[in-house]
Each structure stands twice: as C-alpha cells, then as structure tokens.
Amino acid sequence: MESSRGPPRVKNKAPAPIQISAEQLLREAVDRQEPALQAPTQRFADLEELHEYQGRKRKEFEDYVRRNRLNMNNWMRYASWELEQKEFRRARSIFERALDVNPTSVVLWIRYIESEMRNRNINHARNLLDRAVTILPRVDKFWYKYVYMEETLGNIQGTRQVFERWMSWEPDEGAWSAYIKLEKRYNEFERARAIFQRFTIVHPEPRNWIKWARFEEEYGTSDLVREVYGMAIETLGEDFMDEKLFIAYAKFEAKLKEYERARAIYKYALDRLPRSKAMALHKAYTTFEKQFGDREGVEDVILSKRRVQYEEQLKENPRNYDVWFDFARLEETSGDPDRVRDIYERAIAQIPPSQEKRHWRRYIYLWIFYAIWEEMEAKDVDRARQIYTECLKLIPHKKFTFAKIWLLKAQFDIRQMDLQAARKTLGQAIGMCPKDKLFRGYIDLERQLFEFVRCRTLYEKQIEWNPANSQSWIKYAELERGLDDSERARAIFELGIDQPMLDMPELVWKAYIDFEEYEGEYDRVRQLYERLLQKTDHVKVWINYARFEINVPEEEEEEEEEEEEERPVSDEAKRRARAVFERAHKVFKEKEMKEERVELLNAWRAFEHTHGSPEDIKKIEEQMPRRVKKRRKLDDDRYEEYMDYVFPADDQAAASLTKILQAAHRWKQTGGQVVP
C-alpha cells in the first residue's frame, strides 16, 4: 500500500537521447491549436431587421451596464455602438449616465469629448471640456484638448482665456511651454516674455531659464539674453547652480564671437561648482579653447565629405532626382554660385528616358528650383527667363504638359513688370496644350488686374474647348453676377443647363436656382424647378422645391427690411409647399416609385410637424406606409422573400374597388335586381 503512494520513482536518471526545448513545446501547441470561431457577417435586408437588431443590441448593452455599473468599458462600448448607428442623442444620454456613475473617469471624458468633436458638435465639445476642467483641473489632457480645439477654430482670445485658467493651477512645464508656443505662433513676443517670467517663478529649474534665454536669442536682443542669464544665476544662487546653464550662456557668447566673455563665464562657473558637478563644463571649456582654429576649413572638410557621398550615389543612378535636390541644396548653403549652377546644369541634363508624365514629375522640379534660385538668390533675371524658356521647349507638349511651369513663367514675367510677356506665355500655353488649370490661372491673373473683358473672353474659350466642365459655367456666371450683370449671368446659366454632356449637371442647376433665389426672382425659380422636373423625377428635386416654397416671403415681407427678426411661415407659403408635396406624391404613386414615395412622405411629415396643424399631421400620418414581407417567383421556379411597402391609401382604393365588383356580381346573379 505504501509503495503506491506518491509519484513513481525514476530508475534511469540519465539524460534522454532527444532533448525537447520549451520553445519546441510551445510551437507544437500553437501549431495544433484550432482556429478561433469567428462571428458570421450580419447583413440587413430592410429597416425592420435593422430596428430589430438595434433593439436587441440595446437590450444586451443595458443588461451589461445594469449588471456592472462601475465597468466604464461597458458604457463606452454602448455609446460607441450608438455613435456607429448615428444615434447621437442616445450616445450623449449614455455618456451622461456613465458620468453620473463615475465622474472622475478620464478615459470616459475623453471618449465623450472626442465623439462630439468628431461629429463637429463644437458647442457640445466646448461645454464638455469646460465641465471636465472644472471637475478635474489637474488632468492636463483635458486642457490640451481644450486649447487645441479653440485654436483650431481660430478663437485665439478664447484659447488665451483657457490657458490663463490653466496657469492659475500652476501646472507642469509642458503646459507653460504650450502657452508660450501659442504666443510665438502669433508673433505675440511680449506676451510670451511675460509668460516666461511667471513660468520661471513657478518652475525655477535651470532648463526653463535656458528656454527663456533661447527665446530671447531668437526673438529678442543679445542684451535681453544676457539679462535672462544674469537673472537665472542670481535667482538660483550657488546652492542650485547647474553646469548646463553656464554652458548655454558661454555658447551664446561664443556664437556672438565674444570669446573673452565666454571664457570669463567658464572660469566663473568652474571656480564655484564642485568637480563632481562640472564634468560636462570642463569638457565644453576644452572644446571651446580648441575652436580658435580656422572654422572655414572645418566646414570645407564636411562639405567635401558630403560631396563625395552624393557623387557616389549619382554614379550608381544618375537619374536619382532626390539626390540631385540634396546636392543642389548643399551647394546653395556653401554660397558658391558657380558650384550651384554646375550642379543644376548637370541635373537638368539627366532627361527622363521615356515620354511618360510619371517619369517627368520629379525631374521638372529641378528646372523650377533652378529658375527660382537664379531669380531670388543669384539675382540673375535674364538667366532665370532663359531657364523657363528652355524648360518649356524641352517638354513634349503634344503628349503632356505641366501647367505649373507655364504659370510660374507668367508669374515671373509679372514680377518683372512685363504684363504683355505674361499674357503671351499663357496665351501660348492655351493654344498649344489647353488645360483647365491653365485657364483658371490665366483668369485669376486677369481678375486680379480687373480686366473683366479678358476674363469673359477666356471663359468663352474654356467653355468652347471643354463645354462639359460644369465648374467653368458656374464660375463664368459668378463672374457676371459679381459684375452686377444679372442678364448675362442668366444667359450663361441657360446655355450651361442646355449642354447635353455636362459632367455634373446637377451643380449647374443648383447654382442657377441659387442665383435666381438670391436675386429674388422667385417666379423664375419656380420655372426652373418645373423645367428640371421635366428632365428628372428625382425625389430630392421635389423636396427642395417644397422647401423653397416655404422660404419664399410674401410681397408685404419683401418691402419691409427687418432681416434680423425671424418671420413665421405664412399660410400661403404652406399651401404652396403642400401643393408641391401632393404633386410629387401623385407622380410617384402613378409611376409606382415606392422608395421615392416613402422618402417624400418622410419629408412631408417633417414639414407638417414643423409648420402644420394637428389635423394636417394626422392626415399625413395616415398616409405613411408599412413594411411587409412578400414572396415572388424566380425564373428557376424558386421563391424569394423581399420587403415591400404597403400604403394605406392604396389599400383603401383596392377595398373600394372590391366592394364595387362584389355588388356587380350579386346584381348579375339576381338577374338585374338590386339586392341590399
């Protein structure tokens, strides 16, 4: 009995002939592991299935959060799901319920705020951020999001107010640095200087004084930099001195070639700092003393090394245009114009091997940078003009062109006060290789010169070249509208909508309608809608037509000039809008366009809920359809189910017809006698 107790004894304790490692065991376990089950993809055939699915999911989520209210992940998953369903009010309600449970959850606040920002609900996001920083003022992430949002919206004054609220809590260094960067971005250097003063009082560490000094070095004067370093040394005292502060101070003086001042700073620091705290200071002082040699010689060595590197790369691939860009920038920093020209000339000599535009895209920028350098840096205007000319000769315009080259050449001529040459360049471009971008650039040039007659001519040529471009017609009409020539604008719109090959005709129609509505020509707008409805029965056109009728003011309202006061919709406007809805409903009913009919009824119901009486609302509600499941036979004798709409009005008409047929049948059976 005793021998059976405990683990069996190992008789042979020698190592096994085949050793198995833990890695091998793990690999075999993973290889033999069965794949995890994946949930099948759900697809919804209709709204009824979707609503059923949504109700089921909501019940599941409510069960989760009811069982474990303190688990914020359940709440956030619930709210995220509602956001995916575009149910923003439900999502807000869920977030607020979660905040009632745990108002200090940073992750929950962030999710809530980001959901509002993502959906561009700015005021909601602002209110949430205000609540968050009030409840949790020590959480920097809320403040960062707050100031980022305000600055993104262009509310700089509001951003400053948020920063000031934040600074009253004396946050860490990152917050102060963010405030300073804000003022630097908007060139408010005095404000930034005042913030640095408060910053160094709250956080007097040496690195912060160095930041202030570098700020003054970049935006202030050398005297201000010295004043900052002096204040830092005086404030820190000998107990809190740091070698980094003195190194930065000395490097600043050396940068200004004040070598004696720098040497004095090094000696002052070495005399007062212990050896254990001044190792880097000793090294910096040694390097400083070695820097009295020829600095130009050192720079030449560095430049020569990089030149050799670039030359080796270009030997491997002479058409590596990125290397040519870097090589040219290197020579530009060296300041030798002859070397720069030599590199650019060698670079532009590497013409792409094929006449495919994708091979020329990078190459063409070599010409652009070369011409700009000659004009701006070398001040050689004639050579820059020659570069533009040679580049335009080189491009195979019959196969492709680069509008940017033509436009840059024209802009160069304008900078040289040669307007005729600029016009000649752009005219030549349009004649050789017309492109929409060229037309736009030429028209913008003439518009800036207030040459509106030339603008008209260019628009006419563009439309003649490409009449299918909807934007050309719209821009042309907008030009005439800006010149207060409504008749010409109207004529252009008329020509535009008559074009059979427009790429986006709906944009031209919309612009024409908006133009007439802006001009107050409401009868013309109605005529346009009627003409458009002759071409299409799109439900959006009908809905927009009805909305237009709602917004049309009466004659008495047009005479009064009280634009600030919002007026109620008149009964006549409601009548006109209902007439449009009724016409549309009749059309869709006759053509059996059920989807469009449902969308129209939804818009009609929204209109009645906003402007109608309870009787009108009841009337439209009675017309709303219901979804039913039907079956239909396929070609292979199988049946499939589909969802269809059943309209109450159609059911009533069918019922009435059935009653008439039944009465006729009874009359026939009774031999012509009327049976009640």
Curated annotation (Swiss-Prot):
Cellular localization per UniProt: Nucleus
What is one term from the GO cellular component aspect held by the record?
post-mRNA release spliceosomal complex
Instruction: For this UniProt record, give its keywords in alphabetical order, as a comma-separated list.
Output: mRNA processing, mRNA splicing, Nucleus, Repeat, Spliceosome
Record carries keyword Repeat = yes
Q: Where are the HAT repeats?
A: 52-84, 86-118, 120-152, 154-185, 187-218, 220-255, 257-291, 301-333, 335-369, 379-415, 417-448, 450-482, 484-518, 520-551, 572-610
Spell out the residue ranges making up region: Disordered. Answer: 554-573
Which family, according to UniProt? Belongs to the crooked-neck family.
Function as written in the Swiss-Prot or TrEMBL entry: Involved in pre-mRNA splicing and cell cycle progression. Required for the spliceosome assembly and initiation of the DNA replication.
Q: Report what the protein is called.
A: Pre-mRNA-splicing factor clf1
